[in-house]
Amino acid sequence: MNTTPDMPTPRALRELTPLEARILGVLVEKQHTVPDTYPLSLNALTAGCNQKTARSPVMNVSEDEVTTALDSLKHLSLVMEGSSSRVPRFEHNMNRVLGIPSQAIALLTILLLRGPQTAAELRLNSARLHGFADISSVEAFLDELAARAQPLVIRLPRAPGARENRWMHLMCGEVNVADFAGPDTGGGTDSVPPSEFEALKAEQKRLADEVARLNALVQRMATELGIDVDAPGDVS
């Protein structure tokens, strides 16, 4: 689904470091979400790399580390430094170097910033970068990225109980897909996503605490009224 047939011929690239990949993701993201401050200063770029939300994994890098990574990205022509400002500012050049359209850049950016995602998650999380009409259009661009001579993404095996496959970027090199498959539990039912499972555990604890509080209140009131009340779990 290449909607821009005149895209430049893609170049072969070396594997990026996690920080280099994070920098590219931040530059594309901020280009769309805060265009008034783009290209980014070193300070803004570092803050974006260390951002706590919409990042996986969360990083804590210094400006010196970002500067070193920027130098490497400039040698690869993936990043350009502007000269029209007193403060150095940086912008990405991914479209031209990778030879892919903006729709694919949007999907790749989310994978760079957030880690493995399903097509549905990518459509949702990339909305501020590009509005995809449906999940099938997301998958079409992902399939193109995966079918390149130098693949940029890979479809991970569906984890046991999961309804959808996740996708992962390959900008930092090949991955062992078995690491992302998860253990085979042998069950035939759908599993609960980790976030929902944690929420259920928290709700269970809250309800248990509430029951304990109400039991204590009943016992206290019964004592004050001189009423004999069986303790919870007693069988008369």
UniProtKB/Swiss-Prot annotation:
Q: What is this protein called?
A: UPF0502 protein BamMC406_5439
**Origin superkingdom:** Bacteria
Q: Which family does it belong to?
A: Belongs to the UPF0502 family.
HAMAP family, per this entry?
Answer: UPF0502
Database matches in PANTHER family = UPF0502 PROTEIN YCEH
UniProt cross-references to Gene3D superfamilies, sorted A to Z: Winged helix-like DNA-binding domain superfamily/Winged helix DNA-binding domain
Organism, by scientific name, is Burkholderia ambifaria (strain MC40-6)
Pfam families from the entry? DUF480 (PF04337)
